[in-house]
């Protein structure tokens, strides 16, 4: 969501106003908070039924890889191993679809699991603790790995091959057959 609307912080507005006013969900051309390009004013809006998280690893304003990152696929695997199935994950974003049937307990579970993953990442927990199923299935490959080791290895691969640029090109009209 845009950090500001009409020069005021997004979250300073009353919920009722946000719920009824599309200005709070606009993708403004050229804005740095979303990283999208090549579209016109009022062409796209944030879908309030989609919860998209961007994982660390890419500086959105500069479009450059940072030294360390958390590939979204790793967070997605952690969530799946803990009974939460994201709609999709790509290089550095993970999407959840929210329906009117979602209850507070389900949302709190999602937030708590993401916060727990962050604590495990900060503690550089052993991979066997963070992703036990993945570890068990590939114990020899991941012996002595920590969660940060796995994140760094995959992030370095993304950075070495500039996968974000390849992914972006895949969806450009000029690249289509």
Across the structure, where does each feature detected by a protein language model lie?
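Non-catalytic terminal extensions of PLP-dependent enzymes
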Residues: 1-177
């Amino acid at each position: 969501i845009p950090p500001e609307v009409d020069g005021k912080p997004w979250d300073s507005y009353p919920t009722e106003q946000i719920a009824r006013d599309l200005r709070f969900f606009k993708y403004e051309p050229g804005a740095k908070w979303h990283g999208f390009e090549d579209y016109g004013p009022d062409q796209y809006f944030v879908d309030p039924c989609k919860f998209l998280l961007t994982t660390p690893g890419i500086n959105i304003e500069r479009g450059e890889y940072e030294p360390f990152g958390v590939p979204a696929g790793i967070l997605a695997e952690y969530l799946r191993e803990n009974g939460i199935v994201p709609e999709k994950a790509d290089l550095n974003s993970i999407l959840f679809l929210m329906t009117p049937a979602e209850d507070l307990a389900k949302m709190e579970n999602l937030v708590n699991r993401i916060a727990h993953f962050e604590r495990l990442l900060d503690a550089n927990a052993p991979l066997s603790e963070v992703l036990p199923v993945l570890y068990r299935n590939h114990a020899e490959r991941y012996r002595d790995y920590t969660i940060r080791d796995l994140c760094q290895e995959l992030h370095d691969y993304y950075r070495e091959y500039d996968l974000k640029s390849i992914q972006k090109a895949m969806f450009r009209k000029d690249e289509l057959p």
